[in-house]
Amino acid sequence: SRGLGDVYERQGLEDHRVQFTPDVMPADILGFNMYQKNTGEFVYYPGTIMCNLFLADEINRTSPKTQSALLEVMEEGRVTVDGVSREVPKPFIVMATQNPKGSAGTQLLPESQLDRFMICMSMGYPDLESEIAIAKGKSTAAGFGELRAVLQAQQLVDVQAQVENVYVHDSIYAYITNLMNKTRNSNYIELGVSPRGTIACVRMAKAWAFLQGREYVIPSDVTDIFMDIAKHRIVPNTKARVAHVTEEAILSQIIADTRQPASYMEKVD
């Protein structure tokens, strides 16, 4: 998180980090109106969400009420306080960390909240060489000073627009939809991926194709990111839990059972 903040500052962007403890209130995130005696008016004081990069650290330690404060802004890019809506700056990104399920003092994130995160990744433990480097102090805060920005704010917005223009063939749309439908009809899944997850898969596949230097999406772009966009959106049922079948195993089988399209590059103008 420290490294991300430094990079954003070098890009001329604003980042805010909030430690989500149980006493954090929605107003701390969204902002609040305060009455000014001298003018007789209410003045809006922006919350920490008014930034380009918002990092919610240990998001599952705070109350469900505070967690839900992020629902509107993550979906619509705006906050509403006392009936007045305000746009957040662009570009706008929300990132969060959470403690393992069952850890002391944690609250489970509701499905509606999880669904708004495009991807979910587990950092896990570092490999042996990386941990040795950490032990030697080679991956400390001092190294963040060497980070440099390769894009400025407007350039980042322009790149996002380019990603939106990446071509997706109808057969790829059908392939993605088939994958999502199979999560909803699996014998091991109680709650499958929502239509919002389908949209996230398309957008993430476009971004992955763009990073590979392509202007069109191929099936492997979808399979490469499918696990990261779907794993946090499905809820295994009792049968899966009793059989100790993991989310990864379920989704891997769905990928294996879904036929990939043979044609996906013919662009129709």
How would you label these PLM feature ranges?
Residues 57-58, 69:
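Walker B catalytic acidic pair
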Residues 36-55:
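Conserved alpha-helical scaffold flanking the Walker A/P-loop in AAA+ ATPase domains
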Residues 1-8:
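Short, small-residue-biased leader/transition segments that mark boundaries at the very start
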Residues 10-37:
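AAA+/P-loop NTPase substrate/partner-engagement loops
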Residues 36-41, 61-66, 74-151, 156-166, ...:
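Canonical AAA+ ATPase core
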Residues 146-201:
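Conserved AAA+ ATPase small/helical "lid" subdomain
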Residues 14, 52-53, 232:
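The start of beta-strands in P-loop NTPase/AAA+ ATPase cores
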Residues 185-269:
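C-terminal engagement/docking regions of AAA+ P-loop ATPases
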